[in-house]
Structure formats: structure tokens, C-alpha cells
């Protein structure tokens, strides 16, 4: 999120009945948590908003540059994601597990961010993440075909 909009976004979520959320501004201007430096977080929890910074390096994740995670054409990005979900180590896996780990914490599935990161890594290592990815791809293709054939 844009830094000057984060408080309004958190307030809007609270007004809509959301009880747990993070509105983030990633290092380098990302709209997700970055592994390149500190990230600003507005945390909504039970109607209260708290602001803090979270840094991937504090969870043992190597610092990487934005160029290390930059994608390209959709086909290239899918190949990168498939490699990542197949267990390929590196900056893309790091940013995926960091964001997923934080999301698992915010959703109440993980007890803390470290636990969430470990769960995300386990999902990749077990093959569960790639199974979900392939299912999403299949559903997307099926729905696109269905929409193309409708009058």
C-alpha cells in the first residue's frame, strides 16, 4: 500500500468488520513484504491498529535485492513459481515463504511469524503448495474456456 494510505486502509478494513489484517508497504515500494529491507506494517487486530516494522532478516531470511525477485513475461513467471514450489532455493522462495508465513500468522493459523514461515516451507517441501498451484491453474483454464464458449 502507499504509505500515505495505510492508516485509511486499515480503518476501512476495521469498519467492514475485519478483525485481523496487515496493511503493508514493502521495502523498495513493494505492495507486499520485501526481503530487501524493513517493511512498514499497520496491523489491525480486534479493532486496534498498531504500526511496526518487520524485516525478513530477523527471521533468518537472506537479504535480496528487488532485481533478485523481478519476474518477466507471464510464462516466465509461471516457470519461476513452479521451480519455487518444486523446492528451488533462493530469493523467490524466500519472499514467498516470508509473505505466506506472515499471512498464516495474520489468519490465526500459525502462532507467530516464525511458525508461519516454517509452515510455508513445509508446504513447499511436501509438495502441497505445487498441488494447490496446479489446481488453481486448472480451474482458471476451465473457467476461461467456459466463459469463451458462453453466448
Show which residues each predicted segment covers:
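Glycine-rich anion-binding loops and their surrounding alpha/beta cores
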Residues: 1-151
Amino acid at each position: 500500500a502507499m504509505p500515505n494510505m495505510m492508516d485509511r486502509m486499515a480503518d476501512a478494513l476495521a469498519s467492514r468488520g475485519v478483525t485481523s489484517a496487515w496493511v503493508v508497504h514493502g521495502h523498495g515500494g513493494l505492495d507486499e513484504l520485501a526481503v530487501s529491507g524493513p517493511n512498514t506494517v499497520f496491523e489491525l487486530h480486534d479493532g486496534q491498529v498498531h504500526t511496526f516494522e518487520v524485516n525478513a532478516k530477523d527471521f533468518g531470511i537472506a537479504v535480496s535485492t528487488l532485481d533478485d525477485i523481478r519476474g518477466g513475461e507471464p510464462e516466465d513467471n509461471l516457470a519461476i513459481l513452479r521451480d519455487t514450489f518444486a523446492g528451488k532455493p533462493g530469493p523467490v522462495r524466500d519472499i514467498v515463504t516470508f509473505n505466506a508465513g506472515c499471512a498464516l500468522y495474520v489468519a490465526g493459523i500459525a502462532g507467530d511469524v516464525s511458525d508461519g514461515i516454517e509452515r510455508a516451507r513445509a508446504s513447499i517441501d511436501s509438495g502441497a503448495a505445487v498441488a494447490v498451484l496446479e489446481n488453481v491453474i486448472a480451474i482458471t483454464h476451465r473457467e476461461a474456456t467456459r466463459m469463451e464458449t458462453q453466448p
